[in-house]
Every structure is written in C-alpha cells, then in structure tokens.
C-alpha cells in the first residue's frame, strides 16, 4: 500500500522550508532515493478504483419493484398454466432482459471521467536526478523531485516553484481564470488563498504559456489537486433524476396496487366464489399482467432516445438518456463563466489613444503608435494556418491589429526586432527595440499602468509630442480606473526613439518614454448568451454564475448578461473565501440572495449545487474545466462543452453542447419540457388502458365472467399499444410550453389533470368493454354456449384493442380537443395507428392466430357493435374536455 503524502500549505512556506520538508535540495534527488520514494508513494497516476463486473451491473437492473413483480408473474404463469403460459412468460422476460441490458449500457461514466484525467497528464518530465537533467516518465516523479518547466510544457505534478523567469501558467481548467497567471516567488500567501491566487505554485495538468521555471514536486498522483478532484468524482453521490424519481414512485404505486388487487381478487375467487387455489392463482396472475404496463420501461427509453436524436440535430449531445427529461424540469442553471458564458478568448474592447476612449470596432490609422506598440512588444507567433500561438493577452493584441488591417508580420520585415527586455513579474513591463529605415531605433514598451506611467515624461496627441502634465496623468488614471471598473484588463503603451541600441537595462530602456495609449481587454460574453439568459428567466429558470475567476470580472460579465441587474447597487457576488467562513447550515440560510459566486474551488461548486438541491430545486450545471467535473456530476444534469471542454468535464456530464453555446441549453430545455409532457401522455395512455384491464378482470371475477385472457392483455399491452405510445412520445410541443414555470423536483407524472384523466378514462373504457361483452351475451348469434362465450370474449378483446387506438387521439392533450391540437401533425403517429390496427386484426383473421388467441370470427353486426363501442370513447372524452375547459381547469393546470 502506498505511503500517505502530506498535503501541506506549501504556498505559505518559503522555498527553503519546502525543500527541507520534502527532504530535497536544488541539486535534486539521487536515483536511489527517487526509486525508494517511488516504492513508498506509488506512481504519479490516478487510481481507477474498484470496477464493478458486467454481471454485477446487469443484476443491479433487477432491483426495481415493478421488474420483480413482472418476473414473478412470468414464473407463476408457467407454474399455473404449464406450456400454455410459456409464450406469455417468454414475452415478459424478454422485455425485462432488454431493459436491463440498456441500463448496463448507460453505466460507467465515473470511470470514463477518471480515465480522461489520466490521459491529460504530461508523458515526460525533465527532472534533476544525480545532479543531472534527465527525462523522466511523469508517472515516475516523486515528492522532492526538482522539475524544470518551460513554455509549452504541461505541469507534470503539483510543485512549489523555486525559480520563475517570466513564468506564466494557464490554469483555466483548474480555476476558471481565462488569463495565464504570472508566477511570483516573493508572494506571501495566507492559508485561505484560493488556488488561483497561489502564484508560487504550479499545479498538475496546467499549461506553461511563457517563460521558464524550476520547482520541487510536493504531491503526486491522488494527492495532487487534480487527484483530489478525481477522488471527489469517484466518491460523488449521483442524484436521481426527476424522471427516475417519478418512475420509481410509479413503480411503487403500481406494485402495491397490483399486490392489493391481486390479493383481493384471489380472496374473492376462493372465499366468495368457492374456486380452488390454482384457478384463483391463475386469475391473480392474469390481473398482475393486466395491471403492469410491461412495455412502459422500453417505451420511455425509446421516447428518450428519439428526444436525443432531435437534440443532436440542435447541437446537444445526450450522454445519459434521463437527462433529456431532466432538462425540462430544470429550475436553476448554474453556469461556469469562462468558456461557457464567455468566449474563453481575450479580446480588445476599448482603446484610449489621442486623448479619446474609442471602441475596438472603430478603425485606427495604421500609423497609430498605440497600435504599433501593442504589436511590437509582443511574442505571439503565427503558424502557417494563421492560428495565433502565445499568451492569450498578447494574441488578443495581435488579433486586434489584424482586425485593423495591421499585420505585424509584414511590418516587422521593414522594422525588425533587434533587442528586447522580456516581461517579468517584478517590473510588469516588456520592451522591444526595432531598427528603423532612417537608422534610428523605435523602443516599444507595454505593461501595467501603475508601473509604466511612472516612467513616462511625454505624451502624444494626434501626432504631436509634448511634456506630460499632472492633468494628463489624472485623465489617464481616471480612464484606467473606469476601464478596470468594467472588469477590463488594462495595459499601457509607451515608446521612444533612440539613436543606438540602448544598454539592455530597465532603467535605460524603460525611462523617458512617450505615453501612447491604454488598451482594455476582456474575455467577452458570448453574443447569444444575454438573450439566452432572458429566455431562461421568462421560462421561470434562474441562471446563476459560478466561477473561479476574480470577483470584479464575474460581476461585470454577470451584469452585461443580465444575470444580475446592472442598476442594482447591492452586492450580488459571493466569494469562495466568504463561503469558507460558513457552515453548510449557515450557507443554506443565505445562498438564495446570490446570483454570482466568484473565486470558488471545486468543493465550493459542489456545496453551491447541493444547497439549491436541498431547497428542492432541479439544478443544471455547465462547465468546461477539470475544476467543474465534481459539480457536473453532483448536479441533476451536468452539461459539458464539446469544443473547449476538457475530456474530464465531458466524462462527468450528462449532456455535451457540441457548439459550446449557452443558448443551446435553452433550446434543450424546451425539448426536455416537450419530452416530459409526451411521457406524461404515454403514461396516461398506458395506465388508463391498464386501469380498464384490471377493472374488467376484477369485475369479471366478482360476477363469474370470463372477459379477457392473459394472452389478449399481453398482445394489447406489448404490441397493439406500443406503437401509438411511442408515437405519442414525439408529439409536437403544445403552444406556450416555454412560458410555464418549471415543473420542479416534487411534481409527478400525475400532475396537471393526468391522474383524474387516467381514472375516469379507465372507468369509461371498462364500461364500454363490459357493455359490448354484455351485449354479446344478451343478443347471441349462436345457440351453443361455448360459441356464444367465444363471440363475447372476442368482441370484448376487439373493443378493448380498438378503444386503445382511438384513445391515443384523446391523449394528444389533457384538456384541448383533438380537433384543435391537430390530427395529422405527427407523422409517426399517422402510420402507427393503422399499423397497430393491422396487428390487432392479424390475431383474428390470420389462420393459426385465432386458435392461439382463442377468438372467433365475428359477424358484420358484431363488428358494428364493437366499432360503435370503441367510437364512443372519443365522443365522451371530447364532451368531458369541453366541460373542463368551460370550468377553467385547463388554465389552472399550467
């Protein structure tokens, strides 16, 4: 077993303290020590955890009460009916096994997420071993190893930095911050500093974008920050979706109802009618078969699958089927900021030049020195395909130049760079020197306004250079402050001309400068995101932002998107540091007042999601980074990003946006609401039929009739009803579906008038079937009892089958007339009804089938009676719907 590693607060300690704590030095470890530590601590990789066998996953699918009752019914059918009941049993068991196989297919997402985490790791690291730089498999790194870093590297383990030469590391996947972090060894950090502020640390799987560094490995494997997230993923409790909760509730209700009714029926058969135990048991089994909609699990699966196909065409890839319906229940959309609500691409938004603040969309003159400086003092590379490679801030400046028709590659041909002073975190400046055609040199300097303004002695306005005044400086500082309030990252541009290449010292190169301008940049919101937020609010959904980025940036983007009111001066931002001060109970009391959470860790995100879930809300969480994975898994529906998202976040999600478009979520919510509405229709359709079947058998038992046989019920439930039920699952959305409030976690399939419809429509079907059965007995066309009984049995069976087909039209809407919702809008429905009719008729007219189904040939008169009986189903339901609309029940159900 691997030795436990310390997860100390290394960022609060000096380099010397950390080296001492890790038993290391700047010379690195010896090979012997490294080998011993590898044996002690284990490899630098993530644990896979104990994997369940395929058989265990398969057996887990049979824990549902309804499935157990179905299996019991199949076994009892064989016991009581022998070979005659074998066909019924095989049909039931086939449905059960197919459903279980699909359930197994849906499992295993946590393992996939952890595998993706493993694949992100850097394969090779450069470490100091035996006082030499050697390439080491990153999985063989151990605590105490000294590792070298340079631009382009993936950080192979968590480490405390010992050297940082202009080192910048992009940590967006861990922190959500879109700008690479300038690493600073001199920083003194508090114990509660969030990951994004730990500027003297480098974390596994982060990307080195600039400079060089040296660090001592502090943690490997599952003890790294990424490993910590992997552990959270593996141990996360997945929340049952509202659909699963509803299906579980439905299973329990049906199961208990079946047991009670079967017991009562058996008691009546034995004690009232004096039947033997075996015949009574056969009747009870028939009733169980009638009561349980055997095809429901499979039909729900098919409806959800069809929903996934619709969503796939609209850029939403569903990874877990129940997520389709969960979308429709969503009450809270907790969105990550970077890459989800924003473009994850730094962009120039404002330029202050010639004493004026202009929008980036306005055209600048190609000779504008601000434009020249931002492109000259820049290390961005352009690959052959035109892709910009480098620090996101610098690539934003070059992209702005290209948008202004200023191609720095062309300009540098005539004004080549001949010297430079690289950026470092102490000066916070970068300077380059460029040869001019006249023989002199142009010095371009960019950097932090507070550092650069002190080195400026002149200012340029419209081509004229003059001494800078205090009033000029106040105007520059005021503009800088105004841009910073908008959460823009501000850089200052300055320059000077010199006669010779200066001595490359900061005091020489970066003094006596001419102020040129300010540039304000931000990772901007997606163009369609604000409209999506508005539509979400209109649909009764509350969008909130959860990000690891800075408070001011988060608040500014949230106001621009409408997540919080731009005119409201109250503090709407809650930080991770503040959250650390609260217990879960304390946070539960205040969380509702905040719409934006900034500077939060993965644990914080999970706490926020759980707080909303504890309040009974259905939560959708979006994200694209490694840091989002635990909360994606905890949420009712985790939504990953297909383009910018890490494989880890995709693996932990239920749904992936193929276009990374926040607005696509709203489209998916509409589809989800439609899917739930259609599943409701399917359940209403099936359960009203099952109610009728149960009542028919129960009443037949009570009065000594023989109305329907188990094979009739199985054929209707599994074959005749299945096609219309599936077709109802793809009905078009009813008008106004996105103006309703979300149905919420605690609503059921029986809400909105569905339960009352199931009851009265089930009773109505029973009355019509028994009415036709009674007619056949009262007005027989034969004199022999067996033939009379065969006709009555056949007419009852045909009437029930036809009622199911016409009733499918009734179920298109709970309250609206079938003639207003549209008879022929659903193409699948249009052909499913006649096809189901042919399947029903096949059992009567196809030779061989009639004997198997125990039916007789009906006369024209008998056919007319069955058609009238089934047709009355539509007439009566239409009358009831008309009365309900007059009473306003349709409006109350919304």
Residue ranges and their predicted role:
Residues 720, 794-808:
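Generic alpha-helical transmembrane segments
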Residues 757-772:
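Alpha-helical transmembrane segments of multi-pass integral membrane proteins
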Residues 785:
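Extended substrate/RNA-proximal surfaces in nucleic-acid metabolism proteins
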């Amino acid at each position: 077993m691997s030795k436990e590693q310390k997860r100390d607060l290394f960022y609060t300690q000096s380099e010397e303290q950390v080296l001492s704590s890790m038993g290391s030095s700047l010379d690195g470890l010896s090979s012997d020590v490294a080998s011993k530590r590898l044996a002690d601590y284990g490899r630098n990789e993530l644990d896979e955890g104990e994997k369940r066998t395929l058989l265990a996953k398969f057996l887990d699918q049979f824990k549902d009460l309804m499935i157990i009752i179905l299996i019991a019914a199949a076994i009892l059918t064989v016991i009581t009916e022998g070979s005659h009941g074998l066909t019924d049993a095989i049909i039931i068991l086939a449905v059960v096994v197919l459903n279980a196989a699909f359930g197994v297919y849906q499992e295993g997402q946590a393992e996939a997420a952890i595998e993706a985490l493993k694949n992100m790791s850097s394969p090779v690291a450069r470490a100091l071993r035996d006082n030499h730089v050697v390439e080491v498999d990153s999985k063989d790194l151990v605590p105490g190893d000294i590792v070298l870093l340079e631009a382009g590297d993936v950080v192979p383990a968590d480490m405390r930095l010992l050297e940082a030469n202009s080192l910048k590391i992009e940590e967006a996947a861990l922190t959500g911050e879109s700008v690479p972090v300038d690493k600073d060894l001199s920083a003194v950090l508090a114990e509660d500093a969030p990951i994004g502020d730990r500027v003297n640390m480098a974390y596994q799987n982060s990307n080195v974008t600039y400079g060089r560094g040296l660090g001592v490995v502090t943690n490997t494997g599952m003890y790294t920050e990424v490993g910590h997230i992997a552990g959270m993923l593996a141990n996360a409790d997945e929340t049952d979706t509202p659909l699963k909760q509803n299906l579980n509730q439905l299973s329990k209700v049906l199961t208990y109802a079946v047991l009670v009714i079967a017991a009562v029926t058996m008691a009546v058969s034995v004690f009232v009618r004096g039947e033997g135990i075996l015949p009574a048991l056969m009747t009870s089994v028939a009733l169980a078969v009638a009561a349980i909609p055997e095809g429901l699990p499979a039909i729900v699966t098919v409806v959800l699958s069809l929903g996934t196909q619709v969503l796939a065409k609209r850029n939403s890839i569903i990874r877990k089927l129940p997520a389709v319906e969960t979308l429709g229940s969503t009450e809270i959309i907790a969105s990550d900021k970077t890459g989800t609500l924003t473009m994850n691409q730094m962009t120039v938004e404002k330029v202050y030049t010639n004493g004026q603040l202009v929008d980036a969309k306005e055209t600048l003159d190609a000779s504008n020195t601000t434009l020249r400086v931002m492109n000259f003092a820049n290390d961005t590379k352009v690959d052959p395909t035109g892709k910009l490679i480098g620090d996101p801030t610098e690539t934003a400046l070059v992209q702005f130049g290209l948008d202004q028709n200023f191609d720095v590659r062309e300009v540098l041909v005539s004004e080549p760079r001949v010297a430079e002073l690289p950026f470092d975190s102490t000066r916070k400046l970068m300077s380059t020197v460029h040869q001019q055609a006249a023989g002199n040199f142009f010095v371009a300097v960019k950097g932090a306004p507070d550092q650069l303004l002190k080195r400026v002695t002149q200012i340029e306005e419209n081509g004229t250079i003059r001494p800078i005044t205090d009033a000029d400086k106040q105007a520059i500082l005021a503009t800088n402050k105004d841009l910073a309030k908008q959460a823009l990252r501000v850089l200052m541009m300055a320059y000077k001309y010199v006669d010779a290449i200066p001595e490359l010292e900061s005091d020489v190169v970066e003094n006596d400068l001419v102020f040129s301008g300010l540039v304000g940049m931000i990772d901007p919101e997606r163009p369609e995101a604000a409209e999506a937020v508005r539509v979400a609010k209109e649909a009764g959904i509350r969008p909130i932002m959860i990000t690891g980025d800075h408070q001011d940036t988060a608040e500014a983007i949230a106001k621009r998107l409408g997540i919080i009111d731009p005119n409201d001066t109250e503090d709407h931002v809650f930080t991770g540091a503040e959250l650390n001060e609260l217990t879960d109970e304390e946070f539960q009391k205040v969380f509702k007042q905040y719409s934006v959470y900034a500077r939060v860790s993965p644990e914080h995100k999970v706490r926020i999601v759980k707080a909303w879930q504890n309040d009974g809300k259905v939560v959708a969480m979006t994200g694209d980074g490694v840091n989002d994975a635990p909360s994606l898994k905890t949420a009712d529906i985790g939504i990953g990003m297909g383009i910018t998202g890490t494989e880890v976040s995709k693996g932990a999600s239920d749904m992936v946006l193929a276009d990374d478009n926040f607005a696509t979520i709203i489209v998916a919510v509409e589809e989800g609401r439609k899917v739930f509405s259609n599943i409701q229709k399917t359940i209403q359709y099936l359960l009203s039929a099952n109610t009728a079947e149960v009542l028919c058998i129960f009443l037949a038992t009570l009065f000594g009739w023989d109305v329907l046989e188990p094979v009739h019920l199985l054929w209707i439930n599994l074959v005749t009803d299945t096609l219309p039920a599936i077709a109802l699952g793809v009905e078009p959305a009813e008008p106004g579906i996105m103006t309703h409030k979300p149905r919420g976690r605690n609503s059921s399939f029986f809400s909105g008038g569905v339960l009352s419809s199931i009851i009265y429509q089930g009773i109505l079907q029973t009355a019509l079937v028994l009415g036709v059965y009674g007619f056949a007995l009262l007005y027989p066309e034969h004199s022999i009892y067996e033939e009379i009984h065969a006709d009555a049995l056949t007419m009852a069976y045909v009437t029930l089958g036809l009622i199911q087909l016409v009733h499918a039209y009734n179920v298109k809407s709970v309250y609206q007339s079938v003639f207003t919702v549209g008879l022929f809008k659903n193409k699948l429905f249009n052909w499913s009804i006649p096809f189901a009719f042919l399947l029903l008729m096949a059992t009567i007219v196809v030779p061989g089938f009639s004997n198997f189904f125990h039916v007789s040939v009906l006369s024209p008169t008998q056919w007319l009676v069955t058609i009238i009986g089934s047709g009355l189903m539509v007439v009566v339901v239409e009358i009831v719907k008309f009365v309900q609309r007059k009473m306003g029940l349709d409006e109350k159900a919304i």
